[in-house]
């Protein structure tokens, strides 16, 4: 696949991992083709010849970028996978949409903003009186193509997917204006998902870097992306990302609304915010983080905290509430927001604006007061058949994590939980991907549906491409560990295949089956780079004489040769050594 460019800057377009290929599982119609990554395995060589090992198929988030038969020009965007499904239901209409304004990109009228050169199609919206959400269809008993697609991906039945969505326990983020996305589901009875945050800031980064980070993150396994841009060209950056993104995209609309009022929180208005919601809805944002639970009466509860309000969105709304001494317009206009959401099928990610920013503040009154309000808002959204997930902390020590999950399930009626970690200690700047992955694995096991990744740069700076990779892989580990603990169907297949390859010294298969094949091979080759080392029955950790797996295999071979069980072989070996010791005179030192 050829590398493309954004405004003459290089963007890395991926190829598949070594030892893997893109395959598709077909559904009930030819246009339901579910992508998977198939990992080829070599044969096992044993005493009785070779035994074939079946390939392993794994969940694939990389989109068409890793399909050698698809040519991608990121200036044009990805193919519109879902358009036929969306229009075929007969409940959407095209319309002209709003005009893009200079202030959408953070410029004054005389300035010139960057533009996306690709396909300019008219936005879609629900026809008058119609509701186009996946929750609405599920409650009507309709299994949509999106639901069937997901069922194949998750190895469950389409009816199970429909039931989970209808109950509110799962969501399918799927804006009708993001037809490029491959359907996925967020719910605790499915694979634990991970989100990767990208986005420019007023200080650093560019459109090119953010598009590259997006393609990079999905290559390593990000299930959704959040564009948290706060600098110039916000609208255009988002357009580049959405048109080229095969996974759902989320945003925090208050960030862009704040840019439109020059960063002065008290100048925000409902009209500016509403216009921003529609702007982003027309572009195709799949879920909005909205901090509607930050109420005026909750702000004083944060006064005695160690770290106060650490959520950007929460701090913006708290400042607005105090400046006007009024309740947040996100709260007072919530039903109107629901009307917008269901017009495009955008899911709520109800923001935890009062999440704890230190373990000293974990599980405090402010945090749980906001959670109560999020529970109330969830039921209002469900009244409109709008999909909802709930955002969670934050910084929480291990012994307080389960309380968060239990309260969220009870208060928010089992709506999916989406947590940032949580970070389990505050003493490891530079390693917060690890401090948070510990909490993420635990809360994923307890029932969290999606984990927001944390990179090594957390609290320190804007992550670069390498940081994104590190964060995604770390969180894939946490999510997979949670899947194993929950007993998700098929979760252990990959572990078992890798363990078998490890015991049989099939080094390349070990690399190919790992979450980061390139890193695994790199570390192996640092000490044993020769090609022959890829078939050696040892590694540099123990060497040839002390490899426990090689010794175990020797015992098995001895047992087979002598018609013994492995226990009998060990006992026979002990007897032989005892006899040898006696024959040499039974002397302790020879």
Curated annotation (Swiss-Prot):
InterPro entries: ThiC, ThiC-associated_dom, ThiC/Bza_core_dom, ThiC/BzaA/B. It comes from the Bacteria. [4Fe-4S] cluster binds at residues 539, 542, 547. Zn(2+) binds at residues 395, 459. One of its GO terms (molecular function) is 4 iron, 4 sulfur cluster binding. Substrate binds at residues 197, 226, 255, 291, 311-313, 352-355, 391, 418. Its EC number is 4.1.99.17. Binds 1 [4Fe-4S] cluster per subunit. The cluster is coordinated with 3 cysteines and an exchangeable S-adenosyl-L-methionine. The keyword Zinc applies. Pathway: Cofactor biosynthesis; thiamine diphosphate biosynthesis. One of its GO terms (biological process) is thiamine diphosphate biosynthetic process. Keywords: 4Fe-4S, Iron, Iron-sulfur, Lyase, Metal-binding, S-adenosyl-L-methionine, Thiamine biosynthesis, Zinc. Its cofactor is [4Fe-4S] cluster. The keyword GTP-binding does not apply. It catalyses: 5-amino-1-(5-phospho-beta-D-ribosyl)imidazole + S-adenosyl-L-methionine = 4-amino-2-methyl-5-(phosphooxymethyl)pyrimidine + CO + 5'-deoxyadenosine + formate + L-methionine + 3 H(+). GO terms for cellular component: cytosol. Catalyzes the synthesis of the hydroxymethylpyrimidine phosphate (HMP-P) moiety of thiamine from aminoimidazole ribotide (AIR) in a radical S-adenosyl-L-methionine (SAM)-dependent reaction. Belongs to the ThiC family. This is Phosphomethylpyrimidine synthase. It comes from Bacillus velezensis (strain DSM 23117 / BGSC 10A6 / LMG 26770 / FZB42) (Bacillus amyloliquefaciens subsp. plantarum). The gene is thiC.
């Amino acid at each position: 696949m050829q590398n493309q460019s954004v405004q003459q800057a290089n963007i890395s377009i991926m190829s598949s991992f070594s030892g893997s290929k893109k395959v598709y599982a077909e559904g009930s119609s030819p246009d339901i083709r579910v992508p998977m990554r198939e990992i080829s395995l070599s044969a096992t060589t044993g005493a009785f010849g070779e035994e074939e090992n079946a390939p392993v198929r794994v969940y694939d988030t990389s989109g068409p970028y890793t399909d050698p038969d698809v040519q991608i020009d990121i200036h044009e965007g990805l193919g519109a996978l879902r358009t036929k499904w969306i229009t075929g239901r007969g409940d959407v209409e095209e319309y002209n949409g709003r005009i893009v304004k200079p202030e959408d990109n953070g410029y004054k009228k005389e300035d010139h903003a960057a533009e996306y050169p690709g396909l300019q199609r008219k936005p879609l919206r629900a026809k008058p009186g119609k509701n186009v959400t996946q929750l609405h269809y599920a409650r009507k008993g309709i299994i949509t193509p999106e639901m069937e697609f997901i069922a194949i991906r998750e190895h469950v039945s389409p009816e199970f997917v429909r039931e989970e969505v209808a109950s509110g326990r799962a969501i399918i983020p799927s804006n009708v204006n993001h037809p490029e996305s491959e359907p996925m589901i967020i719910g605790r009875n499915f694979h634990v998902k991970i989100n990767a945050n990208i986005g420019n800031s007023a200080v650093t980064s560019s459109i090119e870097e953010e598009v590259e980070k997006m393609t990079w993150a999905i290559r390593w396994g990000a299930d959704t992306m959040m564009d948290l841009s706060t600098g110039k060209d916000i609208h255009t950056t988002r357009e580049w990302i959405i048109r080229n993104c095969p996974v759902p995209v989320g945003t925090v609309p208050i960030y862009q609304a704040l840019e439109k009022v020059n960063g002065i929180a008290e100048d925000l208005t409902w009209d500016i915010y509403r216009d921003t919601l529609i702007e982003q809805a027309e572009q195709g944002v799949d879920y909005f983080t909205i901090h509607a639970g930050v109420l005026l009466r909750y702000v004083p509860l944060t006064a005695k905290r160690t770290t106060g309000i650490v959520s950007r969105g929460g701090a913006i709304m708290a400042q607005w509430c105090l400046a006007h001494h009024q309740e947040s317009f996100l709260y007072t206009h919530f039903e109107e927001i629901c009307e917008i959401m269901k017009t495009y099928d955008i899911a709520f990610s109800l923001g935890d604006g009062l999440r704890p920013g230190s373990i000293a503040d974990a599980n405090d009154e402010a945090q749980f007061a906001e959670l109560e309000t999020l529970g109330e808002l969830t039921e209002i959204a469900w009244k409109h058949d709008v999909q909802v997930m709930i955002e969670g902390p934050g910084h929480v020590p291990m012994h307080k994590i389960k309380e968060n999950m239990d309260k969220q399930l009870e208060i928010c009626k089992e709506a999916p939980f989406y947590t940032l970690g949580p970070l389990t200690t505050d003493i490891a700047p530079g390693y917060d991907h690890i401090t948070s992955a510990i909490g993420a694995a635990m809360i994923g096991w307890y029932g969290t549906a999606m984990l927001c990744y944390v990179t090594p740069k957390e609290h320190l700076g804007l992550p670069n491409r390498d940081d994104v990779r590190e964060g995604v892989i770390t969180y894939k580990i946490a999510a997979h560990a949670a899947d194993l603990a929950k007993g998700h169907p098929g979760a252990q297949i990959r572990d078992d295949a890798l363990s078998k390859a490890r015991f049989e010294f099939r080094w390349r298969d070990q690399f190919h089956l790992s979450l980061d094949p390139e890193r695994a091979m790199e570390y192996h080759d640092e000490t044993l780079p020769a090609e022959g080392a890829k078939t050696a029955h040892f590694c540099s950790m123990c060497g040839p004489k002390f490899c426990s797996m090689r010794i175990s295999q020797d015992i098995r071979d001895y047992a087979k040769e002598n018609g013994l069980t492995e226990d009998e072989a060990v006992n026979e070996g002990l007897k032989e050594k005892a006899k040898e010791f006696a024959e040499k005179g039974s002397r302790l030192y020879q």
